[in-house]
Regions:
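Residue-level signature of tetratricopeptide-repeat
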Residues: 347-348
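Conserved, mostly hydrophobic/aromatic
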Residues: 57, 70, 109, 166, ...
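Canonical Radical SAM [4Fe-4S] cluster-binding loop centered on the CxxxCxxC motif
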Residues: 60-89
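Conserved AdoMet/S-adenosylmethionine-binding subsite of the radical SAM
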Residues: 92, 96, 115-293
Length: 403
């Protein structure tokens, strides 16, 4: 098979893995030094970093052959799809060629399981090692780690990759047993623990070799089973707490041609995936717990965002006096983000906050109005019941512009 044909197959096969954001890696550059590449965003941009940089990654599988038969996966053993396999040398060549053409800033590399977990992990490491040592490539590298691989291989991968990740796959162990019986939650979490241990050791010892400086992430498939959002968020919360993950990515299940009856024939609403990302951001950045966002079983509402849903369910905290409230509570007001909350706190050291200041800070006034008090404003909507406010603030369908 020609290299271009392999690329067509294995780039398409990698599209279902969404955990490829190049985030948190220290900036490195070969400018003025020996070597090749940089982690600075340039060229065609596809992924966004937390500081706003855009980076383009070559996102491929080493192979889509796989020993496992996960029911939700397009590359499962029983799937009738075109198969291909790169050699490590071919991936190195592609990465360097794309970089020299200014098409990418880094590499995201995953793989189906071939021969064994250790053999597959060795092949992935071989790519990263050659890029770093033989070609002095200083761009971003994200490697998928293989559950059940030897911890020594995980440690070696961390020396060459900016980020490592291992997919938790599904929100519950029972779903994993039913849909991917060849995988075990224990081995997945053991790999997460190995990565976390490597990060901890690298931070504790100044002279320790670098180890995945952008941390680790994971991916959870949404809608392949009946798990509700409350369980999903509690699972994510546990992963953040136990293994200090940088990100949990949520991927709405995509129906696969000729898929088994054990998985749905319809995809979940993409808006559900979006709401989970919003809720996840509130847990990571705003101090919300999963129990606050969903106090019981069920899914996040689709018509309003999770922050607004929390505010409507906790009206006793509102309206908030912006001239007196704690910064953490100001950040929980719908329509006011972390940065705006910090600016408001800084501003009130100089003067009393007025409603026009919210406009200047570009807060979302429609959302914020029912929940804030300023020197010259007190909401008339504050006494309205939550159901009425929800109806007014819900994100209803909008007519698309014709041009």
């Amino acid at each position: 098979m020609q290299l271009i044909d392999k690329l067509s197959v294995l780039a398409d096969a990698a599209k279902y893995d969404v955990s490829c954001a190049s985030s948190g890696a220290p900036k490195r550059s070969s400018q003025g030094r020996s070597g090749l590449g940089a982690t600075d965003g340039m060229g065609i941009c596809h992924s966004f970093t937390p500081d706003g940089r855009c980076v383009a990654l070559l996102k491929i599988l080493l192979t889509n052959f796989c020993l496992y038969d996960c029911q939700y996966c397009v590359n499962r053993r029983s799937s009738d799809v075109p198969r291909a396999r790169f050699t490590p040398e071919e991936v190195v060549t592609l990465t360097l060629d794309f970089y020299r053409r200014n098409c990418i800033s880094g590499l995201f590399l995953s793989s189906g399981i071939i021969r064994s977990a250790d053999y597959t992990m060795e092949q992935l490491i071989r790519v990263a090692k050659r890029l770093r040592e033989e070609h002095e490539f200083r761009g971003y590298i994200h490697l998928k780690t293989i559950p059940d691989a030897d911890p020594l291989l995980i440690a070696e991968a961390g020396r060459y990759a900016d980020r490592l990740s291992v997919n938790i796959e599904l929100p519950t162990e029972s779903s994993l047993i039913r849909l991917a019986p060849e995988k075990q939650v224990v081995s997945i979490k053991q790999t997460m623990h190995s990565i976390h241990q490597g990060e901890t050791e690298a931070r504790a010892e100044k002279r320790a070799p670098r180890f995945a400086p952008a941390g680790q992430s994971t991916q959870m498939i949404i809608g392949a089973d009946t798990t509700d959002d409350s369980t999903i968020l509690h699972t994510a919360q546990s992963l953040y707490g136990d293994y200090r993950l940088r990100r949990v990515y949520y991927s709405a299940f995509s129906p696969i041609p000729n898929s088994p009856s054990s998985v749905p024939f319809e995809a979940p609403p993409l808006l559900r995936e979006h709401r989970l990302y919003q809720a996840d951001f509130l847990m990571r950045g705003y101090g919300f717990s999963a129990g606050e966002l969903l106090s019981g079983p069920g899914n996040l509402p689709l018509d309003i965002d999770p922050k607004l849903a929390w505010a409507l369910a906790n009206r006793e905290h509102f309206p908030v006096d912006l001239n007196r409230a704690e910064p953490s509570l100001i950040a929980r007001i719908p329509g006011i983000g972390i940065l705006s909350a910090k600016r408001l706190v800084a501003l009130r050291r100089q003067k009393r906050i007025r409603f026009e200041d919210l406009t200047r800070l570009r807060c979302s006034l429609e959302k914020a109005k029912p929940f804030v008090i300023t020197q010259d404003y007190r909401p008339s909507l504050a006494n309205r019941d939550s159901a009425t406010l929800r109806q007014q603030l819900s994100e209803g369908p909008q007519q698309m512009a014709l041009w």
